[in-house]
């Protein structure tokens, strides 16, 4: 069985254990939707984001413990922050997330994440 690693990232705060937590799973390859749902059920946070790089964009899905959801602000902010913090994307570059709700763009501006719905 493939391993899926995840990070817990707190959005809307600069302090540990504050803000709104989200789990972010950085995927190397596609996993079944049923597996995403099972992972989200196991992680004790409101939302789990699944992020997979494809070409110049990232494909992105959000799950609660009950179901997939069409969009999640704090999950998007947490995921973008993690991609910059881990050096996967340079901080001076924007990130385009392809989602079931359409593309989202994230930019790092003045030490904050700005999300734009395209």
Give short role names for the model-derived ranges.
Residues 1-18:
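N-terminal, positively charged, Ser/Thr/Ala/Gly-biased leader segments
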Residues 13, 52-53, 108-110:
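Short, low-complexity Ser/Thr-rich regulatory SLiMs
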Residues 21, 34, 56-62, 111-118:
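Short, well-ordered strand-loop elements centered on a beta-strand within folded domains, enriched
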Residues 24-28, 51-52:
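Short beta-strand-to-turn element immediately C-terminal to the catalytic PLP-Schiff-base lysine
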Residues 35-69:
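Anion-binding (especially nucleotide phosphate/pyrophosphate-binding) glycine-rich loop
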Residues 63-118:
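Acidic, low-complexity central loop/insert segments
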């Amino acid at each position: 069985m493939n391993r899926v690693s995840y990070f817990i990232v707190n959005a809307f705060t600069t302090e540990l254990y504050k803000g709104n937590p989200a789990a972010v799973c950085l995927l190397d390859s596609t996993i079944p939707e049923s597996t995403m749902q099972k992972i989200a059920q196991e992680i004790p946070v409101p939302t789990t984001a699944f992020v997979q790089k494809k070409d110049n964009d990232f494909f992105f899905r959000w799950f609660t413990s009950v179901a997939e959801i069409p969009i999640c602000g704090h999950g998007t902010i947490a995921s973008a922050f993690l991609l910059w913090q881990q050096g996967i994307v340079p901080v001076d570059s924007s990130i385009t997330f392809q989602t079931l709700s359409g593309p989202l763009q994230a930019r790092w501006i003045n030490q904050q994440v700005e999300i734009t719905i395209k």
